Amino acid sequence: IPLIDYENHMSLDSIMQLQAMSEMMKTQVAAYSVSRIMVLGVAGGNGLEHIQKDKFERIYGVDINSSYLQTVIQRYPELDGSLKCLCINLIDETDKLPKADMVIANLLIEYIGYMCFQKAIQQVNPKYVSCIIQINIGDNWVSDSPYIHVFDDLEQVHHQVEEHTLEDAMLEIGYHSIKTLEHMLPNEKKLVQIDFERQHPICLNRLEKV
């Protein structure tokens, strides 16, 4: 999908998703005391404007689309030296992911599925994971707009993500939810942010015994 079409669609007054995601990411990057942060599915870098360079030792931006990553580098020269963009296909290249203290994954799990996301998190091994998923109150997962047809091919890989199923999938790999926030959108959709923390091994042992 051309980035300009994607961002124009997401920022329409009838959708307002780009603006909402930026505001939510502002709280995500400020929520925890971490030094290495990773944004999976960084796309054009929406929300990176809220990152204070001196707060993080390293910021990883990961995406499958190399042209998106080039745009990120051009848009955020102030993050030069801290920001490292990585072109990685999360379906079959999770072993290339470096370690980080926190992972942010917004509107990503819908396109890679729970199992692939589990593999990525196990590879990165962060203390915190913050996800934003989209819940469709209406019938369509893509809102009507002049740009709707650029999403046609995505329907083949789109998975509907459910809050409780995601929580169960994360618990399987040792992460429990610690925070949930909701943001209503004007198009019969809502964004749900779920934050997870890696459990201490002692806690995991107790769970296994129960």
Q: How would you name each of these model-derived features?
A:
Residues 1-95, 115, 119, 130-210:
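Class I (Rossmann-like) S-adenosyl-L-methionine-dependent methyltransferase catalytic domain
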Residues 101-115:
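A short SAM/SAH-binding and catalytic strip from SAM-dependent methyltransferases
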